[in-house]
């Protein structure tokens, strides 16, 4: 029997985005499509939900074995190891976390608490704690260990009668462990090991020091650092590009995993939150102040009217506001995603040629400078092209219904364009959309009506062949039928 699975081989050309109109929107809407029987790089593709379950396949939580979705209160500490010469693995040269390490570890803990119902409380070094942090410098035979990075134990790990759950250990010979920073591998290491201490496994059955595993050994295609910081493998295997930077906080599949274990934190960022430039998140990894400062994150947001502000970047960007989607931001690829169940309402592009795709909410999309492509999707959207030759794309009557119409706020006659080509494509007719002086009730009729008193043009279209138009866009400015449409 012939396989029904869709096979995709990741190459550079897979992610060469279309640059104009509907094709650019369609490319972005299908960017990093996953699950549903797809195979990528010869491996089964897992959905976000499947990946989250696989990362938690050991079924260990601090609430007990297979006790899922329940909140938890945990303690943590930074022991001084004054009276300990060897840890449980036989490593020596033990030392207390420095002030810098402690600060970065607390930020990593905070990033997990942001997305799940976990409360962390610090206790004194000598007190028993659920999660502990410590450095080592020599391996079991007594050699200075420059090969390993760190390791940790899942909850309820019992070895030779000892409960090792929650212990996390770090090789202080590694400079990024000794001096971790936001975009450095050290910060990711802290967040990764805390993930283990909370109950997360690697996305595949591998561990450092056990053989020589590679991406070819993965269980599913999305086992990369584009989808999970619990992964060992580069984001480039799935077409991402973090530009040599590393995530500091849980990524898309990590959020699904940790919320499966402890439930979602529905008190995180419930107000009107801005991510990127002009950020009010109070989180370093969700904020940037310059074109050279890149962001790598998965957005978890519990409410409010929220904005992706990537206005300070000069590279061409592709911004998708749909849940479980990926965006290319600040010259990187697939470096920003949105967790399941999250609605981000607004997006601001930079000075490059951007593609911005909205969702079913009432979006405000601003292209900024450059030749941008804007697609609001459902909802009553406000579209601002900004300077440059911009294209406003529509693909369904529901994108801009008369009762909830979109507004194009800054249309430039003879420069910008309105793309209705998908309606012709769907009707399999090159002239389905045709402009008329009045409606007769025939499907595909389009009419422009300009009101000079308020400088607003109504674009009405009868998509379904009803008695009245079922599609209406309000446009500030005049529109020329001959030059301003793509059909």
Swiss-Prot record:
**Which residues take part in binding Zn(2+)?**
192, 196, 202, 232
* Residues noted as binding Ca(2+) 5 in the record, renumbered to the chain: 368, 372, 385, 387, 390
The answer to whether keyword Isomerase applies is no
Q: Name one GO cellular component term.
A: extracellular space
InterPro entries associated with the record: Hemolysin-typ_Ca-bd_CS (IPR018511), Hemolysn_Ca-bd (IPR001343), MetalloPept_cat_dom_sf (IPR024079), Pept_M10_metallopeptidase (IPR001818), Pept_M10B (IPR016294), Peptidase_M10B_C (IPR013858), Peptidase_Metallo (IPR006026), Serralysin-like (IPR034033)
Q: Which cofactor does it need?
A: Ca(2+); Zn(2+)
Query: What's the EC number here?
Result: 3.4.24.40
Query: What residue spans do the Hemolysin-type calcium-binding repeats cover?
Result: 348-365, 366-383
GO terms (molecular function) for this protein are:
calcium ion binding; metalloendopeptidase activity; zinc ion binding
List the PROSITE patterns hit by this protein, alphabetically.
Answer: HEMOLYSIN_CALCIUM, ZINC_PROTEASE
Please list the residues that bind Ca(2+) 1. Answer: 269, 271, 273, 301, 303, 306
Q: Name one GO biological process term.
A: proteolysis
- Cofactor: record remark: Binds 7 Ca(2+) ions per subunit.
Reaction(s) catalysed by this chain's protein? Preferential cleavage of bonds with hydrophobic residues in P1'
Q: Where does Ca(2+) 2 bind?
A: 304, 306, 343, 345
**Where mainly located?**
secreted
| Propeptide residue span(s) | 1-16
Q: Which keywords belong to this entry?
A: Calcium, Hydrolase, Metal-binding, Metalloprotease, Protease, Repeat, Secreted, Zinc, Zymogen
So where's the catalytic machinery, residue-wise?
193
If you read the UniProt record, what top EC class would you report for this enzyme, in one word? hydrolase
Give the binding site residues for Ca(2+) 4: 359, 361, 363, 376, 378, 381
Bilayer-spanning residue ranges: none
The family assignment reads: Belongs to the peptidase M10B family.
What role is this protein assigned? Naturally present in the silkworm intestine and allows the emerging moth to dissolve its cocoon.
**More about this protein:** The Gly-rich repeats may be important in the extracellular secretion of this metalloprotease. In Japan this enzyme, isolated from a Serratia strain presents in the gut of silkworms, is used as a food supplement because it is reported to induce fibrinolytic, anti-inflammatory and anti-edemic (prevents swelling and fluid retention) activity in a number of tissues.
Protein name per UniProt: Serralysin
